[in-house]
């Protein structure tokens, strides 16, 4: 089903179901011989979803998830380290945008007094809360769920939940931007900047300028079509991931942040995976993804 500007979803459908795919990758990494991280809650979420009738992807889709598992693990590790480093500077307020099913508020070593705000669709956060409560999981920081769509007035919901914009904050934007229209992406970063005190940090998974080239998109679509045909031959249905994305020209994230007072550093997906000694496979080779870290050094009145 194609996306609309006001759609919503449960954990087992549309954008929500992608969180289960990422949880599969985290569960796989956690059980590997030399994991970059351990997320003992990933399998808990998968089991809870299965109890609701969800079935893990098999065939071509399952193969795709396994193929990008090293990328997903590297991404998780980068954001984990980003939060921990922010805590090392004394930042004790974190906001996870589109938090999905990653249990960072439960599994990371937060400094004393840290408040972690998680923003996502109401049904996603309810599933997460119910599952973790049933598992008797206790957060490692003060956890505050903020159930609101990021295309709505989430800043008001965040402040109403206790967020203090006068304190430095560490923000994460992971696995989110392609699910937002271009204008919504700009608005997201405008709001983050407005809510950030100087010294705040932001970590972003972004696409480079090469992602939206005709050449790359054509290669990607061909690969997806091949996988969907393989799934059909096996009698399985593989949804088209592009139906969930807004594929349109948008601002280059590092440039946008620098233009609005953020000091920025970047690393490509390939270089990040090399850092963690993870192989770049045919499914991840040439993936034009950037991991962007920013520090707000010039708070402006805009």
Question: Predicted segments — roles?
Answer:
Residues 145, 153-156, 179-197:
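A short, conserved alpha-helix within the catalytic core of class I
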Residues 1-146, 165:
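Rossmann-like AdoMet
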Residues 2-5, 214-302:
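Rossmann-like AdoMet/SAM-dependent catalytic core
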Residues 170, 189, 194-210:
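Conserved beta-strand signature within the Rossmann-like core of class I S-adenosyl-L-methionine
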Residues 18, 155, 168-169, 181, ...:
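Cys-based phosphatases of the PTP/DUSP/CDC25 superfamily and their flanking regulatory architecture
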Residues 163-184:
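A short SAM/SAH-binding and catalytic strip from SAM-dependent methyltransferases
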Residues 151-152, 177-179, 208-212:
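Short, catalytically relevant binding-site loops at active-site mouths
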